[in-house]
């Protein structure tokens, strides 16, 4: 499962939308940064530098709105000069899914320390969420850039005759297809080795939440601590 840092201009709006996009794409969200999260600039930079995520999702601003806050976040990312968790020979991917008027400013602020990918604004208006393009870009980059650095993955690609999907994306698609085919609301739980994922489709809207520290192998000690030996 890919690990991500997400950032948005406003904690209760674009940052939450970015988190939903990342979770829906199958990621573990390591932290959520926002311009109004109470952290000082140097604290934000230290946090970004210390996390070593697989990629970063940056959002902020409705289309045509202010560009200041999201550019400030981009400058913090650039100052942190983050390194990816896997692989030393490529730059960390950053997906920008914010105010379209800020694209050039964000690109200039990030500079050459990261590889920037631009997709549609995930919050084009205050009332509208548009999570699909960001989710798809996260999944594509995970397979193309992150998994390509994983030991043995190139050999696996040679063996496989079909496209390889991350488990959360595959389970999420299954839940969506069941809900659509049966015209019902659907809830599914996937208990994995390191994480437990809950998928839902209600009124046609797909969501995924993840507990990143509860699972049946790598994280089983956390389950024991939560439940007790009895």
Language-model segments: which ranges?
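Nucleotide/phosphate-binding catalytic cleft detector across ATP-hydrolyzing
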Residues: 1-185
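Glycine-rich phosphate-binding loop of actin/hexokinase-like ATP-binding domains
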Residues: 176-230
């Amino acid at each position: 499962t890919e690990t991500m840092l997400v950032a948005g201009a406003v904690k209760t709006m674009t940052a939450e939308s970015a988190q939903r996009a990342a979770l829906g794409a199958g990621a573990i969200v390591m932290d959520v940064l926002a311009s109004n999260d109470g952290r000082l600039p140097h604290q934000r930079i230290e946090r970004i530098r210390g996390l070593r995520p697989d990629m970063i999702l940056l959002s902020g601003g409705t289309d045509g709105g202010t560009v200041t806050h999201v550019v400030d976040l981009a400058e913090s990312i650039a100052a942190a000069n983050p390194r990816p968790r896997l692989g030393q020979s490529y730059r960390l991917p950053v997906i920008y899914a914010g105010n379209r008027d800020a694209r050039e400013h964000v690109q200039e602020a990030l500079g050459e320390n990261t590889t920037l990918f631009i997709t549609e604004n995930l919050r084009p208006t205050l009332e509208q969420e548009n999570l699909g393009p960001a989710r798809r870009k996260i999944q594509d980059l995970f397979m193309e850039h992150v998994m390509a650095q994983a030991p043995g993955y190139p050999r696996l690609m040679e063996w496989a005759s079909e496209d390889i999907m991350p488990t959360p994306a595959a389970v999420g698609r299954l839940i969506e297809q069941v809900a659509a085919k049966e015209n019902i609301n659907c809830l599914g739980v996937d208990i994995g080795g390191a994480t437990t994922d809950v998928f839902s489709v209600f009124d046609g809207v797909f969501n995924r939440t993840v507990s990143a520290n509860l699972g049946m192998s790598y994280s089983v000690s956390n389950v024991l601590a939560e439940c007790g030996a009895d």
